[in-house]
């Protein structure tokens, strides 16, 4: 609820995360706004670190550092990282999905064993993305997968995504919210 109005328009993750941040820092619902903003600060910081890791994996240390510094220098990230909104958290979740996708795809192309860790990371972050802002993370990821499939005709790497089980996991993560707003 916000000012006595139910807030079903936005998915619930940001509210849950902000409530946890307030509780973990010893506050209550009437606490100073900075406690609510901690989620955005943490998410913006995580996004920079994930991009550094992704860039390093794909192109080397210099590229990873350059990408992270560019993201860090973007005015929008600085702004979104200081407000109690969903965008920094959405960016972090989406970047985690993209990083896991890169590990799965490039791992297959390079003949690397990726294990199940990146699969779990991909689909859990997808579920979190659904809870943060609905279809945005799946849409971005779907476009990425489609782009790769157009460029790379060998689609054997898609088996690493195990989409049936993965979609079920992501929906299982998001299901409590979907059930709550329809009940």
PLM segments and residue spans:
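Membrane-integral, polyisoprenol-dependent glycosyltransferases
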Residues: 1-183
């Amino acid at each position: 609820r916000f000012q006595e109005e139910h807030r079903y328009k936005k998915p619930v993750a940001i509210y849950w995360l902000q409530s946890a941040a307030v509780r973990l820092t010893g506050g209550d619902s009437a606490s100073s706004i900075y406690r609510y903003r901690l989620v955005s600060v943490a998410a913006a910081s995580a996004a920079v670190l994930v991009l550094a890791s992704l860039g390093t994996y794909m192109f080397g240390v210099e590229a990873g550092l350059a990408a992270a510094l560019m993201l860090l220098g973007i005015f929008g990230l600085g702004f979104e990282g200081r407000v109690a909104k969903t965008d920094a958290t959405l960016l972090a979740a989406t970047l985690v999905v993209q990083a896991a996708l890169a590990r799965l795809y490039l791992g297959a192309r390079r003949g690397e064993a990726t294990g199940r860790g990146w699969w779990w990371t991909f689909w859990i972050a997808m579920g979190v993305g659904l809870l943060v802002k609905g279809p945005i993370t799946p849409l971005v990821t779907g476009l990425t997968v489609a782009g790769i499939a157009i460029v790379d005709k060998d689609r054997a790497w898609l088996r690493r995504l195990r989409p049936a089980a993965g979609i079920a996991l992501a929906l299982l993560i998001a299901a409590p919210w979907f059930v709550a707003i329809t009940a």
